[in-house]
Amino acid sequence: MSGILDTVNLRTQMVGQNRLELLLFSLETDQVYGINVFKVREVLQCPELTEVPRQTTSVKGLAHIRGETIPVLDLSEAVGRMPIPKEDHRQCFLIVAEYNTRTLAFLVRKVDRILNTQWDQIMAPPAEIGVENYLTAVFEFEDKLIEILDVEQILADIYPMHTKVSEALATPEMKVKAKAHHVLCVDDSSVARKQMQRSLEDLGVKVTTCNNGKVAWDMLNNLAEKGNDVTELFLMMISDIEMPEMDGYTLAAMIREDPRMHTMHIVLHSSLSGGFNVSMVKKVGADGFLAKFNADDLASVVIERIKKVEQRS
């Protein structure tokens, strides 16, 4: 028990310090990949899977783990690589993770180690590879290029998310009010940025997107240096937590420490839900936490903010 508590305490101390832990793994080649440990519930040898008729190709079946039935995705096949042969499944591993309030297991060939590093060592993918890919970040380790997959993009291709805001929320009256407001959305996942932008524009809000915390901070800082009141320019900022170069915790903490923008309304948005994130959001001074992704939940947070601002004016 003391070991578990030590791990929790270590991760708690990492919050706001731009640090992260990555679980390294490989698929059907020598390429090494990483996944944020915060998203991982457990790693185990692949058990026998129950096949599901007429399922998506990359969904290999269901695993029964600790009384829970969890869908298993062949991560290699999901990203367009060779699938792991069925006869090899029992020699492979499952990474059980939580994304967008959904518990899934990713089938991988090997699991290597947990690496403690810093977000400012994690870089956005090279622009030359284009936008149609499953990478969200890369970093160098022991002369190797480690790739961090955009799991949200992978899951969106398998389980498409609805971005339409319900008519009960996106009323004609609210759309008129929303047109006067501008929301800053920060996320390293291209699919997450598109989801937020589509939903908020459906509501009527103007949207600016940034692909990581550093890009957002540089933009806000430049605006402030030019004499702009960013808290007047933006109704609020909705930011992912896990991002290359600067994470959402650090971005929120830096905004709170800057007298030019410290009153900005900040909501942190993550595919990893749970009490841990909620408590850490409070620690760095954010105003709220929102689990990914539900269009109406996102719209409700923005509508609530619009109403509060209008009450004060």
Where are the language model's segments positioned?
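An acidic, low-aromatic, low-complexity terminal/linker signal
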Residues: M1-M237, I241-T250, E257, H262, ...
